[in-house]
């Protein structure tokens, strides 16, 4: 969270190994009042502000959009304190959903029910769906996928694709080895 360290590692250690494997630079931003929000900025932009956690979502949205980026809630129906649908910001202003560009509709570390609700929400608001592994361990990398056209190779191309509300194919496999999976839901 709040770090591009995974992207930096790929860029410096793995990027030249497989030219056909495309990695987009993004961040899961931990807001003050709206849980985790995925942010993707244009490839040539270095905005260190994204690595400082705790900004309110009503400040994050215009910053991201003014710099040409896109954003959407990660695991919106997941654990209470990390998920948008349980947040103070959503409860104060449900219409804030219309300010997002996409919604994570499949998260490999969330339940089928949580993912199904996220998909329904994306359809209701006509937002592009994405998927993520939410990997915090190397063993859970690759449990989710989002299919996009092959010609999209840069963040700016992905941003335009999503801004035009293009639909994607998303899915994956639920990763059962999370702490919640071992201990049960809180």
PLM features: residue spans?
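Short glycine-rich, polar/acidic loop-and-turn segments at beta strand-coil junctions
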Residues: 1-2, 27-29
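Phosphate-binding/switch loop-helix module in NTP-utilizing enzymes
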Residues: 56, 60
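Short beta-strand/loop segments at the ligand-binding rim of alpha/beta enzyme cores
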Residues: 67-77
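Histidine-centered divalent metal-coordination motifs
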Residues: 1, 75, 136
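Caspase-like (clan CD) cysteine peptidase catalytic core
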Residues: 52-54
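Charged catalytic cores and adjacent phosphate/nucleic-acid-binding surfaces used
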Residues: 8-18, 22, 29-47, 61-66, ...
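Divalent metal-dependent hydrolysis catalytic cores, especially in the metallo-beta-lactamase
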Residues: 1-5, 70-72
């Amino acid at each position: 969270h709040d770090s591009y360290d995974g992207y930096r590692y790929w860029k410096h250690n793995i990027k030249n190994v497989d030219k056909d494997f495309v990695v987009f630079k993004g961040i899961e931003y931990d807001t003050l009042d709206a849980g985790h929000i995925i942010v993707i900025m244009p490839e040539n932009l270095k905005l260190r502000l994204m690595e400082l956690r705790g900004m309110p979502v009503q400040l994050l949205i215009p910053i991201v959009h003014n710099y040409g980026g896109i954003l959407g809630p990660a695991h919106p129906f997941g654990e209470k304190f990390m998920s948008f649908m349980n947040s103070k910001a959503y409860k104060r202003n449900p219409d804030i959903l219309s300010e997002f560009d996409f919604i994570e509709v499949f998260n490999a570390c969330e339940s089928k029910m949580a993912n199904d609700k996220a998909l329904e929400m994306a359809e209701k608001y006509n937002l592009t769906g994405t998927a993520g592994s939410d990997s915090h361990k190397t063993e859970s990398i690759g449990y989710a996928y989002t299919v996009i056209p092959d010609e999209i190779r840069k963040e700016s191309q992905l941003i335009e694709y999503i801004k035009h509300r293009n639909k994607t194919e998303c899915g994956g496999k639920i990763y059962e080895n999370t702490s919640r999976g071992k201990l049960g839901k809180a």
